[in-house]
UniProtKB/Swiss-Prot annotation:
It comes from Rattus norvegicus. One of its GO terms (molecular function) is SH3 domain binding. Residues 514-524 have a biased composition (Basic and acidic residues). This is Breast cancer anti-estrogen resistance protein 1. It is found in: Cell junction, Focal adhesion; Cytoplasm; Cell projection, Axon. The modification Phosphotyrosine is found at Y226, Y332, Y347, Y460, Y470, Y508. PTK2/FAK1 activation mediates phosphorylation at the YDYVHL motif; phosphorylation is most likely catalyzed by SRC family members. SRC-family kinases are recruited to the phosphorylated sites and can phosphorylate other tyrosine residues. Tyrosine phosphorylation is triggered by integrin mediated adhesion of cells to the extracellular matrix. Phosphorylated by SRC kinase in a EDN1- and PTK2B-mediated manner; phosphorylation strengthens its interaction with BCAR3 as part of the PTK2B/BCAR1/BCAR3/RAP1 signaling pathway. The modification Phosphoserine is found at S237, S390, S526, S535, S737. The lineage of its organism: Eukaryota, Metazoa, Chordata, Craniata, Vertebrata. Residues 167-182 have a biased composition (Pro residues). Residues 233-249, 715-753 have a biased composition (Polar residues). PROSITE patterns: SH3 (PS50002). The modification N-acetylmethionine is found at M1. Keywords: Acetylation, Cell adhesion, Cell junction, Cell projection, Cytoplasm, Phosphoprotein, SH3 domain, SH3-binding. Residues 164-277, 393-416, 503-544, 705-756 are annotated as: Disordered.
Length: 968
């Protein structure tokens, strides 16, 4: 009887149960399944079945397929101990030096055990096209698995090859182990690479009954056909009688049964190390496996994380240059060894890794972390590779050492004996014991190493970060984003308020200037506990600021305002907590039996809210009285409207509080009254925040600055300096400042017209609607807004610089050429040079250009200072406007020269540089808008700084061109 060898999957034919398959865009016929081997008779001799397993050969008796089928080529059949050969047209994938790569164009779901499943976009290695004579079916490898795929669903990537020879794959996942001729025990023949790896199987996986077919059990005389090694200490021979189960390939993975013959044929000791595919793919890529965590491996974060600080150029002469070292030091706040890793820093992470002083610098750490957390009793040397715990648990203890063969190329770096436990993978011995994973003790989560150096076995046993040595209030242990002063609730209890005691300076973290207001707190608490009406409140002894008295200093006022706002938020939060706890488990509102509410606690909490809101109102009233003396006439009306809203809220609180006070828990007090009081109190913190924000935004106008205002004559003389020139200048625009402009000296028409005209030209921060935008722009130009930024105040030098820039930028350009006298008499130029009129024009505007360049340089310096000190948008936007207006004067000079000069050369060059300056100004406007909208984005601010630096260089070129033209 003859036997037909079907290598891979033969052509689909209608014989012996094979069927034609028609399936969409694929090839017309589906290849014959490898599962025909289930029909093999057990009594057939095994000596004629030597077909390499790399191509998933299956053996089928010719009688089973029908007598009409032709026999295979003689060379495809191996007899006796003849060397295995492939059928004609089949070439082993491992014999190729390079394999072409292909990309999946469509999804593919495997419909037979020998077919690969893949998704659209997957990249796979094409081992052989039209494999085994199957037209349109390719033998491919994907994720360590081999199988056939429809070629019309792949696209060959031209010029792209697999960097290394085809990785030995598991072959067709459902192929049963191939019998081998009997050999003496201990003798191992080379095995094709594809048969040396089988997918690892989780213990939980159990094949379904319909997915399992059995391979006939060999008799005792046929045991040698399986080529199982003998009593080699590294391998276990399968028993004489055993049953191997195999499952169909699923769309994702194919898993064999967890039997003792988990691997089809264990590799022999003489097999090449590079052909052993028992290492996870990530372990063979070299020394870059676990150098640093992925979040730290990308040195520059590739744009996902901007630099921590903006690099500002330094001024050198009249230009600006970047310092190379400055950018390297300030751009990233990372340890130096992470910026320049060397060969000795292969696994160079911060000291929290627990590195010991005597450890090697060149150790690689090729083991995934889960390998060091193996089962109990395992020898650590066998944990070099990532063994899934589920597979290990399913194996007998005697097989632990025979599962994986360690390639010499990897194991040569592994120290022997106890050195592995101490130094190889930086894992303390304590980690060898199974422990539940604690994220807080993970080496990459720890923020800093413990202060003391613990023993080696306690590397990760970090003591608690905050031992309770002191009685710290819980509020101090839970810092939140909104806790400005972090008030412990247990220290703001209402009984202290009722007693009239003064809150100590430890409750609010107020700087020393605000501590002078402590007696005021006592008066506030004692006066507010009476629950009096509005008339009595105005006559109380609260002394925040009394109208008619000198306003508070700016710093003290800002600090007091923040303290008052925080007091309102804290007292309301306490009231809401008190009422909320009543509805909780065990509360007096949660039980069916009526209980008496804690009236005294509720009254004290309501009184505290009244007092906090009342004190904020008194502070706001004093600010309203100060608003009548500011340069902005609309400020008083706006602040009055904000104050009136807060007054209405306070009156509502007083009414509900009086109901609670008069009821005293009797018939006059109901739970509905309490609910209405709580509902009214919920909106109080937001109203107080709006009022405080408005006061803070105009604090520089409402309160006295730290720098005492100059004497009267100085202020008045600076105001009346060339008023006609200011009014007629093209650069005239309001820069209101409290010491200068008053209601008598600034006509309404001039202020409004010039402000609107400036808005038309430089409105580039569109954050609100038109009206809101114009109001914001006007505030940006006020010196008070600049003063109140930067955490309370700017330095005195910056304030003087801002005032000087106001005057310089507002100074108009001189157009009167008739009254101009050159510093040196005009010398006639060379023949064919400029005419006298053009030379005079160039010299005149060259002087104007140099004067304005000084102003521009000062404005750029101030702008860079604001950016370098991380000032908020309202500061650097105002400084950028000084830069823009100063540079715009140079554009005006160039435009005038291009229109009045007679020489074509002068007109062309001046026009070119004027257009260049205009383009740079547009770029500065756009980048400044982006930096303001994206604040505090360092990348956006850096782009803005770069544009201003380019503007400085271009203005210097413009001046040099004017000088060259004038000297021609």
């Amino acid at each position: 009887m003859k036997y037909l060898v079907s290598v891979g999957a033969g052509p689909a034919r209608r014989a012996g149960g094979l069927e034609d398959v028609s399936w969409g865009p694929r090839v017309s016929r589906r290849p014959q399944s490898y599962r025909a081997a289930r029909h093999v008779n057990e009594s057939l001799p095994r000596s004629a079945f030597r077909v390499p397993a790399a191509h998933g050969a299956s053996v089928t008796p010719s009688a089973a397929l029908g007598s009409g089928l032709p026999e295979t080529q003689p060379e495809a059949v191996c007899r006796g101990t003849e060397k295995p050969r492939f059928a004609e047209g089949c070439k082993p994938a491992a014999s190729r030096d390079k394999n072409v790569l292909a990309k999946a164009l469509y999804d593919n779901v495997a419909e037979s055990p020998d077919e690969l499943s893949f998704r659209k976009g997957d990249i796979m290695t094409v081992l052989e096209r039209d494999t085994q004579g199957l037209d349109g079916w390719w033998l491919c490898s994907l994720h360590g698995r081999q199988g056939i795929v429809p070629g019309n669903r792949l696209k060959i990537l031209v010029g792209m090859y697999d960097k290394k020879p085809a990785a030995p794959g598991p072959g067709p996942p459902a192929t049963p182990p191939q019998p081998q001729p009997s050999l003496p025990q201990g003798v191992h023949t080379p095995v094709p690479p594809a048969s040396q790896y089988s997918p690892m199987l989780p213990t939980a996986y159990q094949p379904q009954p319909d997915n399992v077919y059995l391979v006939p059990t060999p008799s005792k005389t046929q045991q040698g056909l399986y080529q199982a090694p003998g009593p080699n200490p590294q391998f276990q021979s399968p028993p004489a009688k055993q049953t191997s189960t195999f499952s169909k390939q699923t769309p994702h993975h194919s898993f064999p049964s967890p039997a003792t013959d988990l691997y089809q044929v264990p590799p022999g000791p003489g097999s090449p190390a590079q052909d052993i595919y028992q290492v996870p793919p990530s372990a063979g890529t070299g020394h870059d496996i676990y150098q640093v965590p992925p979040s730290l491996d990308t040195r520059s974060w590739e744009g996902t994380k901007p630099p921590a600080k903006v690099v500002v150029p330094t001024r050198v002469g009249q230009g600006y240059v970047y310092e190379a070292s400055q950018a390297e030091q300030d751009e990233y706040d990372t340890p130096r060894h992470l910026l320049a890793p060397g060969s000795q820093d292969i696994y160079d992470v911060p000291p929290v890794r627990g590195l010991l002083p005597n450890q090697y610098g060149q150790e690689v750490y090729d083991t995934p972390p889960m390998a060091v957390k193996g089962p109990n009793g395992r020898d650590p040397l066998l944990d070099v590779y990532d063994v899934p715990p589920s597979v290990e648990k399913g194996l007998p203890p005697s097989n632990h050492h025979s599962v994986y063969d360690v390639p010499p190329s990897v194991s040569k770096d592994v120290p022997d004996g106890p050195l592995l436990r101490e130094e190889t993978y930086d894992v303390p011995p304590a980690f060898a014991k199974p422990k539940p994973f604690d994220p807080t003790r993970h080496p990459l989560i720890l923020a800093a190493p413990p202060p003391d150096s613990p023993p080696a076995e306690d590397v990760y046993d970090v003591p608690p970060p905050a031992p309770d040595l002191y009685d710290v209030p819980p509020g101090l242990r839970r810092p939140g984003p909104g806790t400005l002063y972090d008030v412990p609730r247990e220290r703001v209890l209402p009984p202290e308020v009722a007693d009239g005691s003064v809150i100590d300076d430890g409750v609010y973290a107020v700087p020393p200037p605000a501590e002078r207001e402590a007696p005021t707190d006592g008066k506030r608490l004692s006066a507010s506990s009476t629950g009096s009406t509005r008339s009595s409140q105005s006559a109380s002894s609260l002394e925040v600021v009394v109208p008619g008295r000198e306003p508070l200093e700016l710093e003290v006022a800002v600090e007091t305002l923040a303290r008052l706002q925080q007091g309102v938020s804290t007292t309301v939060a306490h009231l809401l907590d008190l009422v909320g706890s009543a509805s909780g488990p065990g509360g007096w509102r949660s039980t069916s039996e009526p209980q008496e509410p804690p009236v005294q606690d509720l009254k004290a909490a309501v009184a505290a809210v009244h007092g906090a809101v009342h004190e904020l109102l008194e502070f706001a009233r004093s600010a309203v009285s100060s608003a009548t003396h500011t340069s902005d006439r609309t400020l008083h009306a706006k602040l009055s409207r904000q104050l009136q809203k807060m007054e209405d809220v306070y009156q509502t609180l007083v009414v509900h509080g009086q109901v609670l006070d008069s009821g005293r828990g009797g018939p006059g007090f109901t739970l509905d009254d309490l609910d209405r009081l709580v509902a009214c109190s919920r909106a109080v913190p937001e109203d107080a925040k709006q009022l405080a924000s408005f006061l803070h935004g105009n604090a520089s106008l409402l309160f006295r600055r730290t720098k005492a205002p100059g004497p009267g004559p100085e202020g008045s003389s600076s105001l009346h300096l060339n008023p006609t020139d200011k009014a007629s200048s093209i650069q005239s625009r309001p820069l209101p400042s409290p010491p200068k402009f008053t209601s008598q000296d600034s006509p309404d028409g001039q202020y409004e017209n010039s402000e609107g005209g400036w808005m038309e030209d430089y409105d580039y921060v569109h954050l609100q609607g038109k009206e809101e935008f114009e109001k914001t722009q006007k505030e940006l130009l006020e010196k008070g807004n600049i003063v109140r930024q930067g955490k309370g105040q700017l330095e005195l030098q910056q304030l003087k610089q801002f005032e000087r820039l106001e005057q310089e930028v507002s100074r108009p350009i001189d157009h009167d050429l008739a009254n101009w006298t050159p510093a040196q008499p005009l010398v006639p130029g060379r023949t064919g040079g400029l005419g006298p009129s053009d030379r005079q024009l160039l010299l005149f505007y060259l002087e104007q250009c140099e004067a304005n360049l000084t102003t521009l340089t000062d404005a750029v310096d101030a702008f860079f200072t604001a950016v370098a000190t991380n000032q908020p948008p309202k500061i650097f936007v105002a400084h950028s406007k000084f830069v823009i207006l100063s540079a715009h004067k140079l554009v005006f000079i160039g435009d005038t020269l291009s229109r009045q000069a007679k020489a074509a050369d002068v007109r062309s060059k001046v026009t070119h540089y004027s257009n260049l300056l205009c383009d740079l100004l547009r770029g500065i406007v756009a980048t400044t808008k982006a930096a303001a909208l994206q604040y505090p984005s360092p990348s956006a601010a850096q782009d803005m700084v770069d544009r201003v630096k380019e503007l400085g260089h271009s203005t210097q070129q413009f001046r040099r061109v004017l000088g060259q033209l004038a000297a021609a």
